[in-house]
């Protein structure tokens, strides 16, 4: 008997569809050969710091006493619910899995997690915690969830040990993110008195948006003068722009230059045109699909991912969390089958065997997003699902379209007295080809009716212009930045070798599988916002980045990409889990050492007596604190509370009178300014007083 553990119920149902007739039981399916059961995604999570700490387990107060926490061995436990209590559904399903795997008639176990590092460890954790004795262990790897693919994959399963490096990468990622998230979130939150969510990837994402918005805020436009001619020749306005520019103070100089230019004769010195094929874009990776949907339909990333995941689970598209825009050479027969299905929809598609489509060197784990041979019934998709599915289908049709798109490109060269040449380019679509299905609106750009040797009238004059600020990040530009944060914005996308090298080295920030969730968490935490398809930093994000900067906590793209590279080395067997974890621990240790070396020494005069223990209170690095802080006394007043600096005089008044004057604070959630005093409550904590 073969026991298959799927990552989630929907996948289990699709596996059952591929196997054939099975009886539904309580928490699993079964026939004479197979048992198919499932998890609910992660059934296990890493233990909390308190579970490793020598402090009493009943004490759940965050404290610096158990930081930094570097477990000798990471421990997992069954996942709890949102309230931190035992999840009855999780416990029941795991007990079902445990009972099934340990049945005497089960002699083979199959990992049917999603085909990525996360799916790999989700099922491994179930098996590792359930099995009482070892049994043969295999992997079901599904590029899509159609019955035919499931049936084929069941006959081609490899031993689970062949995916050891993938699992190691998954566990390394889990441990490293726990180390950063738990240690630095608690550290920063304790130091500031505000919950700050610090993570390996969320911080560089928020910081990128913070830096860009700060650039825009501080940008001061400068006036300059461009030399522009807009004069009619044969009834058409011919616009020419010189390469020369002049500053605001050089307007007179610009005018004199224009006068000299207008003396010269402008002549068409060359006219050329050529017919060429316009090729479609590549198949979609998840990033490129989200870019398209965000730009055209203003669809947020979490929504597009949720929809494409549902399409995948319904068997309509291939595995969605892919970073490649290419297909594997061993998928050619599968593509021919998809083409047969797409033809029935009336599209003129034919198989094409090209390096621009099939390229194993540009595939890490999963090939590009495509439709499958399973076509959704008319009306079975809602509007948003149809939009996403159509985008994937239309791109596939464009790639394999029988009809080529031919265009005529033309160029005029106009010389101004032999002193400066100007180029005017145009293009005309001769045959639409694939653009009918995936091209959007293509407009002809006609050249002026001029021939070689024709004279062109000119009337150059200085035209006042302003330098432009950087643009806010959009879904597309932020995604592109995260995919390759070291790529020059101006670098052409025509040659994607640089991007794939960056991905394979681990230089990207986050992955296709994680970025959407992390960006969504940043929005939910009030750090950033998305308006239409444009990202903005919020007050909570400003506060986060500025506080981390004050504490010398750096999670820039360089540090994050170094950790990403370490994970790739684990995946390729070039680094062990322990080595990657030690690397992260050293980075985190530096934060605490820097703070320790800076000391809790006081930078200012004593401002009063501690209301808890009676010792002196003075200004420290992050707060006005008791001289016994943090070892013997935990009293402190943060130097800045919700964006408001707490002056020394107000802190002294709080100690003396138990209350400050009214001050203005900024809500991290709404961004609105509110007025309140600060007071000490019964436990001598600093709280707001609106009376």
PLM features per residue range, with description:
Residues 25-55, 203-247, 399-445, 621-625, ...:
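Structured, non-catalytic alpha/beta "coupling" segments that mediate domain-domain communication
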Residues 9-16, 33-36, 40, 64, ...:
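Amphipathic alpha-helical transducer elements in NTP-driven molecular machines
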Residues 149-229, 274:
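C-terminal or mid-to-C-terminal helical accessory/interaction module adjacent to the motor/catalytic core
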Residues 1-3, 112-115, 193-195, 273-282, ...:
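Conserved short loop/turn motifs at secondary-structure junctions
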Residues 248-282, 290:
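Metal- or metallocofactor-binding catalytic centers and their adjacent structured scaffolds
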Residues 1-174, 178, 461, 468-469:
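Intrinsically disordered, low-complexity regulatory segments
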Residues 2, 80-83, 90, 101, ...:
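Basic, low-complexity terminal or inter-domain segments flanking catalytic cores
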């Amino acid at each position: 008997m073969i026991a298959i553990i799927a990552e989630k119920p929907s996948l289990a149902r699709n596996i059952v569809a591929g196997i054939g007739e099975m009886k539904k039981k309580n928490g699993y399916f079964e026939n004479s050969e197979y048992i198919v059961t499932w998890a609910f995604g992660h059934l296990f999570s890493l233990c909390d710091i308190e579970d490793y700490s020598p402090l009493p387990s009943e004490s759940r107060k965050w404290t610096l006493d158990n930081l930094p926490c570097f477990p000798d061995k990471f421990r997992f436990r069954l996942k709890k619910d949102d309230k931190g209590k035992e999840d009855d559904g999780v416990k029941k399903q795991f007990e079902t899995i445990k009972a099934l795997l340990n049945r005497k008639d089960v002699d083979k176990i199959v990992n049917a997690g999603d085909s990525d590092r996360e799916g790999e460890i989700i099922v491994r954790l179930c098996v590792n915690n359930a099995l009482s004795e070892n049994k043969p262990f295999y992997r079901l790897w599904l590029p899509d969830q159609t019955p035919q693919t499931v049936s084929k994959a069941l006959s081609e399963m490899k031993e689970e040990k062949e995916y050891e490096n993938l699992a190691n990468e998954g566990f390394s990622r889990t441990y490293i993110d726990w180390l950063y998230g738990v240690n630095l979130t608690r550290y920063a939150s304790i130091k500031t008195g505000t919950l700050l969510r610090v993570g390996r990837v969320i911080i560089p994402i928020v910081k990128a948006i913070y830096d860009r918005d700060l650039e825009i805020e501080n940008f001061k436009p400068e006036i300059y003068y461009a030399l522009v001619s807009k004069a009619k020749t044969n009834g058409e306005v011919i616009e020419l722009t010189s390469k020369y520019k002049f500053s605001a103070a050089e307007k007179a100089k610009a005018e004199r230059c224009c006068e000299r230019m207008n003396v010269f004769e402008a002549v068409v010195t060359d006219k050329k045109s050529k017919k060429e094929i316009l090729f479609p874009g590549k198949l979609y990776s998840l990033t490129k699909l989200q870019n398209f949907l965000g730009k055209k339909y203003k669809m947020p990333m979490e929504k597009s991912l949720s929809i494409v995941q549902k399409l995948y689970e319904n068997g309509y598209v291939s595995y969605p969390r892919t970073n490649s825009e290419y297909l594997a050479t061993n998928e050619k027969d599968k593509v021919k089958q998809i083409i047969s299905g797409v033809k029935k929809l009336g599209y003129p598609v034919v198989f094409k065997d090209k390096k621009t489509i099939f390229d194993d060197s540009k595939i890490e784990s999963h090939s590009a997003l495509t439709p499958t041979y399973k076509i959704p019934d008319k009306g079975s998709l809602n509007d948003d699902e149809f939009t996403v599915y159509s985008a994937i289908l239309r791109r596939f049709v464009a790639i394999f379209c029988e009809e080529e798109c031919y265009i005529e490109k033309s160029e005029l060269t106009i010389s101004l007295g032999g002193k400066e040449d100007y180029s005017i380019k145009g293009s005309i679509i001769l045959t639409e080809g694939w653009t009918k299905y995936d091209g959007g609106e293509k407009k002809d750009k006609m050249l002026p009716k001029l021939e070689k040797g024709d004279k062109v009238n000119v009337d150059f004059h200085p035209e006042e212009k302003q330098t432009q600020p950087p643009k806010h990040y959009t879904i597309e530009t932020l995604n592109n930045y995260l995919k390759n944060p070291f790529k020059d914005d101006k670098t052409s996308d025509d040659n994607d070798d640089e991007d794939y090298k960056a991905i394979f080295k681990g230089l990207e920030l986050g992955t296709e599988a994680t970025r959407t969730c992390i960006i969504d968490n940043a929005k939910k935490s009030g750090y950033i916002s998305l308006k239409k398809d444009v990202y903005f930093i919020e007050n909570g994000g400003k506060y986060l980045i500025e506080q981390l900067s004050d504490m010398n906590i750096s999670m820039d793209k360089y540090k994050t990409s170094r950790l990403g590279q370490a994970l790739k080395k684990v995946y390729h067997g070039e680094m062990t889990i322990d080595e990657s974890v030690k690397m992260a621990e050293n980075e985190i240790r530096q934060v605490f050492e820097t703070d320790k070396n800076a000391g809790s020494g006081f930078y200012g005069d004593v401002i009063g007596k501690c209301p808890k223990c009676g010792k002196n209170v003075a200004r420290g690095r992050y707060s006005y604190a008791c001289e016994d802080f943090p070892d013997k006394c935990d009293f402190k007043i943060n130097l800045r509370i919700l964006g408001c600096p707490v002056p020394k005089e107000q802190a002294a008044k709080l100690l003396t009178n138990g209350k400050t004057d009214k001050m203005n604070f900024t809500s991290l959630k709404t961004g609105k300014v509110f007025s309140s005093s600060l007071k000490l409550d019964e436990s001598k904590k600093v709280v707001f007083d609106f009376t």
